Amino acid sequence: MTTRIEVYAGVCGHSAVIDVTKVDDTHVQVVITSACDQITAMNPDLARVQWKGKGHEVFKRMTESAVYQSAAQHIRHTACPIPTAILKAIEVEAGIALPKDVTITFSSPAPNGSPTDESYDGGESIEEIK
């Protein structure tokens, strides 16, 4: 079986489809499909990751997780939700969590001077906007 999730990352305008397939009792394969080159650059790193057992690579401290290490190498936007989405999909595919949507909702408008949907096209980094 394969667990598939869809992620709409936000203002960058990129979405991703993440497929996680259990390869055996301790390993999964992650395949990310997206127009974002930074996200898809993670595919080789996550082609086979050990999620369970001695020496597992996934459910560790953030700085030690294979998912977050790959993200640190390839994704320039620290707040990108894709790494978290990958981990959630691995949990479901491994049978250690139920498939439940995760939501981030802003309950107040952007402060004056902040980028808005009208002024930010997602093509620049935050540093380039300042």
What residue spans do the PLM features occupy?
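Phosphate-binding glycine-rich loops and adjacent basic patches that engage nucleotide phosphates
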Residues: 1-10, 46-56, 93
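Short, charged/polar N-terminal "headpieces" of proteins
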Residues: 1-28
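Ser/Thr- (and often Asn-) enriched beta-sheet segments in non-cytosolic proteins
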Residues: 4, 31, 103-105
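A broad, structure-centric signal for solvent-exposed, well-ordered loop/edge residues
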Residues: 14, 39, 111-113
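Active-site- and interface-proximal helix/loop "cap" or "latch" segments in soluble metabolic
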Residues: 23-87, 97-98
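C-terminal binding/interaction regions
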Residues: 65, 69, 73-75, 92, ...
